[in-house]
């Protein structure tokens, strides 16, 4: 009999961490949730009202405004865009949902840019 020990999948661990955190935080109409998803090639941010189940504002590296630069530079532009779009809709305070990722690198760059452009969290 052969026993195979495999390493845990990093994305599965992240999803488990995200589910655990999502049980504790939720977005409302007054203070929606700023959700971040990070892929190998891009970064996506959404401002979500969980009560109504509606996305209020979003931005990603797929937008035409975001194309050049390193992934971290793109994350800064995405943070700026999502903050501008949220502020334009009258949203000033959000709950930051890092999506189970470490608050470091691209996620931190996006959060800092969103703060600089008018979002409070």
Curated annotation (Swiss-Prot):
Keywords associated with the record: Ribonucleoprotein, Ribosomal protein, RNA-binding, rRNA-binding
Taxonomy, superkingdom: Bacteria
Keyword tRNA processing: no
Keyword rRNA-binding: yes
GO CC field: cytosolic large ribosomal subunit
Gene3D superfamilies: 3.30.420.100
GO molecular function: 5S rRNA binding; structural constituent of ribosome
Basic residues composition-biased segments: 13-23
One GO term (biological process): translation
UniProt-listed InterPro entries: Ribosomal_uL18_bac-type (IPR004389), Ribosomal_uL18_bac/euk (IPR005484)
Region feature Disordered, mapped onto this chain: 1-25
NCBIfam families linked to this entry: L18_bact (TIGR00060)
Role played: This is one of the proteins that bind and probably mediate the attachment of the 5S RNA into the large ribosomal subunit, where it forms part of the central protuberance.
Family per similarity comment: Belongs to the universal ribosomal protein uL18 family.
Subunit (UniProt): Part of the 50S ribosomal subunit; part of the 5S rRNA/L5/L18/L25 subcomplex. Contacts the 5S and 23S rRNAs.
Protein name: Large ribosomal subunit protein uL18
Organism the protein comes from: Streptococcus pyogenes serotype M4 (strain MGAS10750)
Gene: rplR
